[in-house]
């Protein structure tokens, strides 16, 4: 009697593109052997809008409204890096009050970004309730943003040498009330999620990245700190006024999806600590450097001649970038957000290279999902925290 030979065929499955509110327009071509993942190929570029090329045909001030469309859930950070680079290039000082306002806005934006990571991540692994809870707190942050900047999401609030407007009357008290309320919210999330046996079953030991491996892949942010590397640009680069506050770098050593969750939850608590200290110690003074004057190199120009330039107290539309190159970076919620800027003695940058954290963190995905189960792909992808706006640019 002959035994029938069983044929073992691999199956190729397309995952995505998804709706931007979940994982964005990322397509994964997954090769499966039953439930086991054999290979995974990410397909990018569905949200490419040529952000770097647009930057090379705009002045810095014209380009500010565009940058909020990279990572549209943490827009304060994209604005911060866009003004930090020319500030460093031109050695422009930022008033202390403006620096405090920037830190408050950046940390509120970090919390909002982590909240909108937490909800869809929990929904992916089967917990629907936190998805609705996070919008409650996030809405309060957006109310604060709207009161200070006039916009809920695309704020356009940062300026070269400071911020666009001072904090309105009563805003500081409203923000302090939010901080007290939000600490109880974080405690509620931890009670609901952190010790939940079904949640732990889905994330513990899934998508492990070692410390050396994380460095070799160029990972940054919570992805790096969850692998035991205590690297936070707020401590390393000493930018803005973070050194004046008492806070700790949050890290875990396990390197799995649970560790990445714990790092982000702890970071929200640390952000609240920074915001509270900044609100209580915010100094007086100007909110913008009003002495950034751009004088024309040519002497004795007549006001209506072609090469006459308006001398303003604020950074004028003809703000020139000196002929040098610079790499500036900030610690965004997803990792190191950087810009390599080359000036050419003109109003437009000669080169404007964006280093998005999501794009570089996403590189390790095919390696993490190999030999895992199909259901683990969503857990691992969710724990990386990507926004396709900044991945595709």
UniProtKB/Swiss-Prot annotation:
It is an enzyme of class 7 (translocase). It is a peripheral membrane protein. One of its GO terms (biological process) is photosynthesis, light reaction. It holds the Pfam family Complex1_49kDa. GO terms for cellular component: chloroplast thylakoid membrane. InterPro entries: NADH_Q_OxRdtase_suD, NADH_UbQ_OxRdtase_49kDa_CS, NDH1_su_D/H, NiFe-Hase_large. Keywords: Chloroplast, Membrane, NAD, NADP, Plastid, Plastoquinone, Quinone, Thylakoid, Translocase, Transport. It is found in: Plastid, Chloroplast thylakoid membrane. GO terms for molecular function: NAD binding; oxidoreductase activity, acting on NAD(P)H, quinone or similar compound as acceptor; quinone binding. It comes from the Eukaryota. It catalyses: a plastoquinone + NADH + (n+1) H(+)(in) = a plastoquinol + NAD(+) + n H(+)(out); a plastoquinone + NADPH + (n+1) H(+)(in) = a plastoquinol + NADP(+) + n H(+)(out). The keyword NADP applies. The keyword Disulfide bond does not apply. Its EC number is 7.1.1.-. NDH shuttles electrons from NAD(P)H:plastoquinone, via FMN and iron-sulfur (Fe-S) centers, to quinones in the photosynthetic chain and possibly in a chloroplast respiratory chain. The immediate electron acceptor for the enzyme in this species is believed to be plastoquinone. Couples the redox reaction to proton translocation, and thus conserves the redox energy in a proton gradient. PANTHER family: NADH DEHYDROGENASE [UBIQUINONE] IRON-SULFUR PROTEIN 2, MITOCHONDRIAL (PTHR11993:SF10), NADH-UBIQUINONE OXIDOREDUCTASE 49 KDA SUBUNIT (PTHR11993). NCBIfam families: PRK06075.1, PRK07415.1. Belongs to the complex I 49 kDa subunit family. NDH is composed of at least 16 different subunits, 5 of which are encoded in the nucleus. This is NAD(P)H-quinone oxidoreductase subunit H, chloroplastic. It comes from Guizotia abyssinica.
């Amino acid at each position: 009697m002959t035994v029938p030979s069983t044929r073992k065929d691999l199956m190729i499955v397309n995952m995505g593109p998804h709706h931007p509110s979940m994982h964005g327009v990322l397509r994964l071509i997954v090769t499966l052997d039953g439930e086991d993942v054999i290979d995974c190929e990410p397909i990018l570029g569905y949200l490419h809008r040529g952000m770097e090329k647009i930057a090379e045909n705009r002045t810095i001030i014209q380009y500010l409204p565009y940058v909020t469309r990279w990572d549209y859930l943490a827009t304060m950070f994209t604005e911060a890096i866009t003004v930090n680079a020319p500030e460093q290039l031109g050695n422009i000082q930022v008033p202390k009050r403006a620096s405090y306002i920037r830190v408050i806005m950046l940390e509120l934006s970090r919390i909002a970004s982590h909240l909108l990571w937490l909800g869809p991540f929990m929904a992916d692994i089967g917990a629907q309730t936190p998805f609705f809870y996070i919008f409650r707190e996030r809405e309060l942050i957006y109310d604060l943003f709207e009161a200070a900047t006039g916009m809920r999401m695309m704020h356009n609030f940062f300026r070269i040498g400071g911020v666009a407007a001072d904090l309105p009357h009563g805003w500081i008290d409203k923000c302090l009330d939010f901080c007290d309320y939000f600490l109880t919210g974080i405690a509620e999330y931890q009670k609901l999620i952190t010790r939940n046996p079904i949640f732990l079953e889905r994330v513990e030991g899934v998508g492990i990245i070692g410390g050396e491996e994380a460095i070799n892949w160029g990972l940054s942010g919570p992805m790096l700190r969850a692998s035991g590397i205590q690297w936070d640009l707020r401590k390393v680069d000493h930018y803005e006024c973070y050194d004046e506050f008492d806070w700790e770098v949050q890290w875990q050593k396990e390197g799995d999806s649970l560790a990445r969750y714990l790092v982000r939850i702890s970071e929200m608590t640390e952000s609240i600590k920074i915001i509270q200290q900044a609100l209580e110690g915010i100094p007086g003074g100007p909110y913008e450097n009003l002495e950034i004057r751009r004088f024309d190199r040519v002497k004795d120009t007549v006001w209506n001649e072609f090469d006459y330039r308006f001398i303003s107290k604020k950074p004028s539309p003809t703000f020139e970038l000196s002929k040098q190159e610079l790499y500036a970076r900030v610690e965004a919620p997803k990792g190191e957000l950087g810009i390599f800027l080359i000036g050419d003695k003109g109003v437009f940058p000669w080169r404007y290279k964006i280093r998005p954290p999501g794009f570089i963190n996403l590189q390790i995905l095919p390696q993490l999902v190999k030999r895992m189960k199909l259901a683990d792909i969503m857990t691992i992808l969710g724990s990386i925290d990507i926004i396709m706006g900044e991945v595709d640019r």
